[in-house]
């Protein structure tokens, strides 16, 4: 049986959430509360029994793999295979707020009907990790300023692509984290199959409440998450 802990994480007090008191250099402590559902056993991308959202508020943070087994994960910032050329996560996990997870699951159900599904490159990002990224690349064109934080830090943004039901990535024209005009949504100087793949991704995500960034075909923000607070909890690693 899976065991879960519901943690109220005060970022100015120690009440059980790993690294909850960590201060980012040059930043004041985050002093609000977030509820986080933590799997206290070894992580498993496909748990035998899926959890439900019953009784959870829309702002609760959850591990997406505990609520759906229909996604694929390639969490790039837990590796050096990213534009930073640095590993900034201790281990690969995909956490979001409940409202983000609900929208992602609904969108993915529609994708599956079209023979594809979502593959994740990044999800919730602790604010302290945003500072690590800023130290490596202190350029707001590529990394959001951690003082204000980003929607990734709020649990409402994801970096994604589409794969077939057998796990083969659709061609989107560039790799994740390619910064150039070829990755722009408004770049139509691409083969038709790539344009069709991007259109399917964008139109479906928008249908379920997400909006995109013009320069990154992979990045989607949940509109309903814009006013949420920046968070800084870190998930446990083995």
What does each model-identified segment do?
Residues 121-135:
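Extended, low-complexity, intrinsically disordered C-terminal regulatory tails
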Residues 13-16:
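C-terminal motif of bacterial Sec signal peptides marking the signal peptidase cleavage site
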Residues 22-121, 136, 140-215, 221-238:
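Extracytoplasmic cell-surface/polysaccharide-interacting catalytic and binding patches
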Residues 2-8:
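Sec-dependent signal peptide recognition
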Residues 19:
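Short, conserved catalytic or interaction motifs in soluble domains
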């Amino acid at each position: 049986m899976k065991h879960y802990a519901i943690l109220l994480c005060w970022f100015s007090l120690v009440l059980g959430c790993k690294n909850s008191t960590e201060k980012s250099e040059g930043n004041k402590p985050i002093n609000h509360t977030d509820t986080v559902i933590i799997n206290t056993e070894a992580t498993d991308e496909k748990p035998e029994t899926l959890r439900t959202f019953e009784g959870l508020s829309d702002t609760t943070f959850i591990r997406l793999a505990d609520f759906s087994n229909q996604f694929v994960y390639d969490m790039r910032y837990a590796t050096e295979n990213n534009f930073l050329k640095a590993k900034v996560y201790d281990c690969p996990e995909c956490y979001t707020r409940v409202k983000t997870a609900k929208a992602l699951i609904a969108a993915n159900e529609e994708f599956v009907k079209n023979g594809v599904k979502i593959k994740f490159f990044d999800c919730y990002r602790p604010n302290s990790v945003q500072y690590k990224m800023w130290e490596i690349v202190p350029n707001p064109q590529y990394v959001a300023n951690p003082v204000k934080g980003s929607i990734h830090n709020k649990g409402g943004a994801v970096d994604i692509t589409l794969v077939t039901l057998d796990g083969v990535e659709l061609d989107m024209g560039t790799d994740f984290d390619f910064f150039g005009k070829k990755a722009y949504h408004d770049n139509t100087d691409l083969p038709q199959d790539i344009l069709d793949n991007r259109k399917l991704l964008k139109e479906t995500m928008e249908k379920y409440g997400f909006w995109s960034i013009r320069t990154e075909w992979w990045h989607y923000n949940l509109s309903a998450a814009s006013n949420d607070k920046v968070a800084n909890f870190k998930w446990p690693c083995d």
